[in-house]
């Protein structure tokens, strides 16, 4: 009989685990746990085993999940409000969404082995820039509502008038967007002024304007007059735009819009009960250094060839911390890649044809409804119409019985057509309404014959032809060519398909195929987030079970799955703490203590939550300086809101006295926020809710097996103690959250709901005992690497018993003194050895942080040790004067296939040493696509869109 799932999730076999334990001098995994984890917080094995269902095999777990999926009801969703059905091309589903080469990669920090993903993201940025007419577009954000909130805060920060606190919002806006804006605005002291644009009055206290184009009700008025008034008052103009409507509309930049946001969901990304979807954010050159999220830009490599990398990173949270433009790190890369390929697949003509069909069918439907004597509120501009109806609930129920979900309104219903709408569907809608009116439905063929293609979108003219001239959107009309293009990009990218990605604090573990399989089920991915409650019963059961399991694992009382990234979890957790203080009449508490070693998102999130950051020092052992913490807590006792602490620490150790630290903060009136980035070292071993934390965010895309997707999607739920549960985030359209809920932090009630089955499957497959074993093996792998690499690279921090946690920091700073080497030299040379680098220069400059996870085999760990030892030997050759300090395999890394096969080789080391430094690479090697990239050149010469056909032709000439 084959091994069960637990053993296949774990990389080292039982025999290999025994070998590793013997090297560490431990008799078993339980002894290792006792040496790593402080006794005061370590739970026993029986408690971990009994807290959750027992492990099961894939077939059993999938059967149970199929039962939950069957409890969902999938109808044709015409609800709209920013969520629309779409036809995902089978090629994209099979070769991108379901391809581990795309979904198991990490954020492209090591750009030389991420050129494929970066090119796909450049396609997405180019698409958005072409749609909006704005020159700078980022590589995705989390959802449309949070993108709008990011635009608001950018406008607020960019305003030169300190008294300006009024942000004007069009009343006909998606309600979830307005709610997220309200959540974001209140802690920052921003006043939202919601009104019809014609009635807006801009003054010295105004800093921004947000319009929705088309509006939530389906109109598309000409906004140029209100935009002109806003700009005359030095008010920054933002538009939330529908990308499919924007295919037909003039680029909003031509209307005077300075920032455009929206969701690319309807470009081939399933509804997914609300997510994940790629939002976009485009702006002018003036705000390129304030734009939130990742930005892909062109640069050049050491050979002078074009190369892509993440641009302008100095504005991001991992560098600027509390001064960052945003707390966003994880975004929605996999979904942005899908949307970009959707545009490549259809090209500009195909996209235009889809948009025209949707607009024409909507106009024909409106005409047919009017012929039936129904009151269509106004002529639809694009895809949405509103009906005024007597007894609207009866009509909603009638249409639901016929298989259609409409948008319920107090005086009627809304209907939004989409790419999947066709003549038969519109005819069926007309038949249903006609039956309710006691009349005969008009024929859709006759309605279409009387409905010419519109020459406008509402009050705006149609975009002229000639957009999307870039070659990538022109060349791949056949499936054969597009398949080959996708595979060419895959061949340039390093993912878990190729080898270990030992990034510290990132937990690049197995994403099992059985866990991901349900993501493609229609019962999960075709539900609209605002369907009637009776249609989502399967999701309700899954969500309730997953929340209960996560609460049990963490020792907390309640969980919210709404935050759709770890950064959003941090923000939500701090808002919950803030709400609790305010409810107690202590709203003045606004000091957030944060160790200097914390993730950059921590201080950025605290500032977003209206808190003031006070740094706490770390001692020489890498632990929180408890004397400094006590002094700061005492100094700020009257204003102390929270301590943000990562556990195990960002230095890769289980600190002693974590319970005492929590108790200290509580004595001074504060709450403890525990950053769950390192929860993979705690599951089944200790419970933050039991050792003193009040709130914790979890990264389901780390600890609970949702893949990283090359930089998203992620899910960052928060778990809270009982006294904070009433404040869990709510939603304006779907009841959820606590009795005194804070506002939503994401557009959808349960965030990126369609990937929650992945974590459900992981927990169900592993069971309580399996999860504890996974944690123990993660600690085993990290300690094994630490012991084996210590003779070559000093391990910077260890715990009280000489053990590390699930990761370790290797100190490379001595090599700078002895051999003139930088940490980047090792990172780039590791590419030549077939590895992605560990985390570089964080949390300590000049070091690497290694996290092997429980899923890597001993064979892969051996290969990594071999590579690191060989690199150390190369450094030793420099130290001994045997290699030139400036011209050696480390300083010239990585080495491309083009470089080592060039006719001329003038380097003082051999081609073989460059390309095949260890023998195993001869049979299996991913070549870096480009040589080392000049990041500074790219930032000085920012190019973040694809070249057009004409530009390519000029370059070739």
Curated annotation (Swiss-Prot):
Keywords: Oxidoreductase, Pyridoxal phosphate. GO terms for biological process: glycine decarboxylation via glycine cleavage system. Its cofactor is pyridoxal 5'-phosphate. It comes from the Bacteria. The glycine cleavage system is composed of four proteins: P, T, L and H. One of its GO terms (molecular function) is glycine dehydrogenase (decarboxylating) activity. SUPFAM superfamilies: PLP-dependent transferases. It catalyses: N(6)-[(R)-lipoyl]-L-lysyl-[glycine-cleavage complex H protein] + glycine + H(+) = N(6)-[(R)-S(8)-aminomethyldihydrolipoyl]-L-lysyl-[glycine-cleavage complex H protein] + CO2. InterPro entries: GcvP (IPR003437), GDC-P_C (IPR049316), GDC-P_N (IPR049315), GDC_P (IPR020581), PyrdxlP-dep_Trfase (IPR015424), PyrdxlP-dep_Trfase_major (IPR015421), PyrdxlP-dep_Trfase_small (IPR015422). The modification N6-(pyridoxal phosphate)lysine is found at residue 702. It is an enzyme of class 1 (oxidoreductase). Its EC number is 1.4.4.2. NCBIfam families: gcvP (TIGR00461). Pfam families: GcvP2_C, GDC-P. The glycine cleavage system catalyzes the degradation of glycine. The P protein binds the alpha-amino group of glycine through its pyridoxal phosphate cofactor; CO(2) is released and the remaining methylamine moiety is then transferred to the lipoamide cofactor of the H protein. This is Glycine dehydrogenase (decarboxylating). Belongs to the GcvP family.
